[in-house]
């Protein structure tokens, strides 16, 4: 049985043109929790999707400054994880968990 904390680590899959291109290299892109570490991300992906992870790369996208009705606000920072899977394994992100 999967640990409920794994669902807190993986926020959502990233479906963009660039993330679709890296899927050809056995990589999948996820938005993850800001405080999630690489070992936590690896454990969560392996537990939730039943695949073998070989590498995890992370990047933090800084939030943009936006204006709304004259007030200045700031979007939240987003942490993104590029997960490399073992040869011959894949994840279908279009289906839910």
UniProtKB/Swiss-Prot annotation:
Entry GO MF terms: rRNA binding; structural constituent of ribosome
Family annotation (Pfam families): Ribosomal_L23
GO cellular component, one term: ribonucleoprotein complex
SUPFAM superfamilies: Ribosomal proteins S24e, L23 and L15e
Keyword terms: Ribonucleoprotein, Ribosomal protein, RNA-binding, rRNA-binding
GO biological process per UniProt: translation
Homology family: Belongs to the universal ribosomal protein uL23 family.
Annotated function: One of the early assembly proteins it binds 23S rRNA. One of the proteins that surrounds the polypeptide exit tunnel on the outside of the ribosome. Forms the main docking site for trigger factor binding to the ribosome.
Subunit structure: Part of the 50S ribosomal subunit. Contacts protein L29, and trigger factor when it is bound to the ribosome.
Name assigned to this protein: Large ribosomal subunit protein uL23
Organism: Brucella canis (strain ATCC 23365 / NCTC 10854 / RM-666)
Source organism phylogeny: Bacteria, Pseudomonadati, Pseudomonadota, Alphaproteobacteria, Hyphomicrobiales
């Amino acid at each position: 049985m999967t640990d409920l904390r794994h669902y807190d680590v993986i926020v959502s899959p990233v479906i963009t043109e660039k993330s679709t291109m890296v899927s050809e290299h056995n990589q999948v892109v996820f938005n993850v929790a800001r405080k999630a570490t690489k070992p936590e991300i690896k454990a969560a992906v392996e537990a939730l999707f039943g695949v073998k992870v070989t590498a995890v790369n992370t990047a933090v996208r800084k939030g943009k400054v936006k204006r709304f009705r004259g007030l200045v606000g700031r979007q939240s920072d987003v942490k993104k994880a590029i997960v490399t899977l073992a040869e011959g394994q894949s994840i279908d992100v279009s289906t839910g968990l």
